Amino acid sequence: MDHIRNFSIIAHIDHGKSTLADRLIQFTGISDERTFKDQMLDNMDIERERGITIKSQAITLPYQAKDGKTYSLNLIDTPGHVDFSYEVSRALASCEGVLLLIDAAQGVQAQTVANLYLAMEHNLEIIPVINKIDLPSADVERVIEQIDDELGLDSEGHLKCSAKAGIGIQDILEAIVKRVPPPRGNPEAPLAALIFDAHYDPFRGTIIHCRIMEGTVKSGDTIRFMSNSATYRVEEVGHFLLQREKRNCLSAGEVGYIIAGVKTVSDVRTGDTITLDDRPCSQPLPGFREVKPVVFASIYPIASDDYDDLKAALEKYQLNDASFIYQKDSSAALGQGFRCGFLGLLHLEVVQERLEREYDQSIILSVPSVRYRFTLKDGSVVYVDNPAHYPGSSSIELSEEPYIRATLMLPERYLGAVMKLCMEKRGVNSTLNYPSPGRVELLYEMPLAEVIYDFYDRFKSVTQGYGSFDYELIDYRESQLVLLDILVNGERVDALSQIVHRDRARARGLQACERLKEEIPRQMFKIAIQGAIGGEIISRTTITPFRKDVIAKCYGGDISRKRKLLEKQKKGKKRMKMIGQVSIPQSAFLSVLKSDAD
């Protein structure tokens, strides 16, 4: 076990994590020029295109150090975006050390700090690495000061590198060997293995990614998942090189995979402990919490016949994404679908895109919402994340919404614009710090519902991309919440209902009405589109009808003839309006649902 090192790379989004992983893979020689491609560990197209890492990946790098010994370095690559911090915490629980990567030009960012605290919670050895030192705008001295002052780490032990140019890679590998402690654990003890990820293979079933903490597992063993006591027989174990590499056994300290013919996707829970059925460990491994979704939205198939296909796609998708939850839902306007929970807006976008690409689904997403808390007059407390379950306003004693504490780091010149944006989003209790000259750290408490709409995009645009943002949920606070309904031709469209703050209701209602007006085709009769709270109409637009020229055939003559024809047309239109159903096209739903996220 002395020759094993388990480490992870943590950084703010875009600080060069995946590029550094590529260089480490190249340097250790497991990838030649022919098989190499950028972002080796980002397997999904969407990860490559957006340049982000979404899923944790593991790979074993054989490295011959300067002391002449060969070490097995297990790299667990982690995502950097705020929505995926649960993936980071899972990966960190499987490691003994981390490389804390900091961009030499941008310096310490909000997510750097958040991930550092996660690493400290797990008591890991932290090696600060300053990346992109070859950039013209790199300011290494300033970053060293930030490591000392803002992060409270000893900057003496920092390393400098340029992952893109391949500078300083060997120093990093040597530092991992020297400074990251070897894993502890007893290969003879009862098996305890931590699941940090899993993915679905149509031929082999579920492939479990795990770190063996204690004991040994080999093919032929019968394993048990401790959270649900499901048992399976192990078919194959091994390490991840660029592909899966079969081994006879995995023992304490190693990172690898287990294939055990697990077909029921829901049995494999990320963060669960695997043990042997005939010789179980006494208690599960600590440190994992149930991941709680933060943003909720409904997903419907565009064609109602595709419901079963969508259900199968969600089941398979959920295996690769432990934090995604869903349950059945139905809507009068859109038919059968699913109510889903996500970690944040980027997570929601990624799920939507992966369902469309990898599983070939055509779907509609409803307006995203958060989980509100209502205390009713009879004293009971209900949590509502779906506007369809909104309790009647007459029965509500107290309505509350979730608040977050946002940490914003930005150059000082954008301070005014960012404070204005936060105030607009109902931000309160601001704290202002100056961690270093020219840089500001802002702390705000604000409603999560305001953040999930367009806060991130607007924050990025007012800071011209130089700001960074991180948040954590704090508590529920009293708020004036109302249910905004959209009526088309007097009929309530349930898929467009949303729970909003009373001050925002009129603007939201008007925005939805205007969007629908652009998308719904004109009919032969007038269509009213209204936004309503309870019985009160707060916004309205009208789609004017087509008009057939019924008096075209009358030349001159008596006006009463024309009047008679016009009256007849008016009666016909009235009758048409009473029985005429307005069909709302899919594009109209998408337009309204997108309007809040744009």
Curated annotation (Swiss-Prot):
CDD domains in alphabetical order: EF4_II (cd03699), EF4_III (cd16260), LepA (cd01890), lepA_C (cd03709)
Alphabetized Pfam families for the sequence: EFG_C, EFG_III, GTP_EFTU, GTP_EFTU_D2, LepA_C
Keywords of this entry: Cell inner membrane, Cell membrane, GTP-binding, Hydrolase, Membrane, Nucleotide-binding, Protein biosynthesis
GO cellular component assignments: plasma membrane
InterPro entries xrefs: EF-4 (IPR006297), EFG_II (IPR041095), EFG_III/V (IPR035647), EFG_V-like (IPR000640), EFTu-like_2 (IPR004161), G_TR_CS (IPR031157), LepA_C_sf (IPR038363), LepA_CTD (IPR013842)
GO biological process: positive regulation of translation
Residue span(s) of domain tr-type G: 2-184
Domain of life (superkingdom): Bacteria
TM region(s), chain numbering: none
Main location: membrane
Gene Ontology terms, MF aspect: GTP binding; GTPase activity; ribosome binding; translation elongation factor activity
Membrane topology according to the record: Peripheral membrane protein
Family: Belongs to the TRAFAC class translation factor GTPase superfamily. Classic translation factor GTPase family. LepA subfamily.
Protein name: Elongation factor 4
Protein species of origin: Syntrophus aciditrophicus (strain SB)
